[in-house]
Amino acid sequence: MRLRLLPKSTVRRLSFLLAATVAIAGLSACGSGGSSGSAGNATSGTINWWGWTPTDTATADNYIAAFNKQYPNIKVNYKLVNISDWVAALRPALASGQGPDVFDVQPGAYVTEFKSFAEDLTPMAEQALGSDWKSKVAPIGISGLTADGRLVAMSVGAVYAGMLWINEGTFQKYNLSPPTTLSEWEHVCQVLKQNNVGCFVQGAAQEGFDQDTLQSIANSVQPGLWTKASTGDAKWNDPGIVQTLAIWKQMFGDGIMQTGAVGYQQYPDANNDFLTGKYGMVMMGTWYTQYATNKAMTAALSAAGVSGAKPFPILPVAFPDVAGKGNTSEMYGDSDFGLAVATKSKNRAAAETFVKWVTTTTAGQQVIADQLDDLPALKSVEPNLNVIQLVNPSSQTKPVQDLVTSVGTVTEPRESLLSADVQTAILAAATSVATGKATPQQAADTLQQAAEAAGETFK
């Protein structure tokens, strides 16, 4: 799952505090992004990889072990850096030339922050995949990791949102079908509540997940409107955004949202309530696909405090047409993270070999795909569902396969276009409408004012 990094304002403060260190280390020498290290050997050597993800070092070790089957003479050391320490640790290390050879990059502010320390990987992509390499990679993994015409990092995989996950057993028990409209959604909730089962659970206290639901509602109202507001091509108080907030309010008033949703966190509250069977539906993205497997579902149930629970099948379903306009559910996403090669790396060739293997080879991308957390960057690679043990292959294989296939052409971003200030304003708008402290129009106007105050420009 994509982790949210520090807000841009925090990045700016840390950058200012580190300015003296950076200057002493010769930051200006690497400002152009040109190489100042040495190439070294492409098939041997030791490289250091720093990242905030994978958060489970065992997963990183699995990637490295698979890589070493083909390149046994390249030793890769993975260093997990806490997300809150990322900028403070990485920037001076890269500037001094004593930092990692390979480092994680997330779309958005961090591409801008670290682009001068990273090699342009366009030549590597062309060498690995051909001159038409862009046609072979999920587009969302290119746009978010490119700055000033340079490919700052190569996408490892992406996460997408815009759909729901349902408890298949609960829906079967009460003879229910996944809702396709707002009224059908309300009906499903009525039936489940009559049987003392929760319907839909949301951690409405967390901006990122409120944003997912709002973006999906907006796509039902007017496809692409949310992205246009994010880029300044539409305003946040556009009538379509006002209608989006009105439908959001209706979900609270008509009993789709659970009581107390505004005080809920998506993790751990909503996640645990869904996985323990208290609710039949939850708004999660493609990262939730991992829980379609026996292994991950069993581990998740244990983490949720359920002892000896039997894994149950979950299914991805389209977000309902809540606006009733006949618009199909649109997915949106970002590269979860990409791998960059440091300009000052003394083992640049070996570092590029590692990045190339992880991001552009079938073998490397298959390792990523089979984790069912990130979806691979290469369009030609999909999870091997014949090997992965799903909880109920007969019912889950096709929906999971369809989901994986459908996101390969997604171009609408999820979070990468939004500043921290706008994200904070989105949460304020969502909660003020949900609690009745503001009308949809008032909340939209306040959101627009906050975006303008944050320096966003609009046409």
PLM feature spans:
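Hinge/lid segment of periplasmic solute-binding proteins
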Residues: G108-A161, T213, A309-V317
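A structural signal for short loop-to-beta-strand junctions that line the ligand-binding cleft
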Residues: A93, D101, G130-G169, G326-Y332, ...
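Extracytoplasmic/periplasmic substrate-recognition and gating elements
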Residues: D254-I256, A299-D373
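Glycine-centered hinge/linker elements that transmit conformational signals in sensory
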Residues: V191-L192, T231-V262, L315, F319
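Extracytoplasmic/periplasmic solute-binding protein
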Residues: A147-V156, E186-N237, G253
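Extracytoplasmic "Venus flytrap"/periplasmic binding protein-like
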Residues: A66-K136, Q172-T180, G280-M281, A299-A300, ...
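C-terminal capping/gating helix-and-loop segments adjacent to ligand/active sites or protein-protein/ligand interfaces
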Residues: T146, S155, A229, N392-A450
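Long, aromatic- and glycine/proline-rich binding clefts that accommodate carbohydrate-like moieties
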Residues: K136, P311-F319, A369-D421, A425
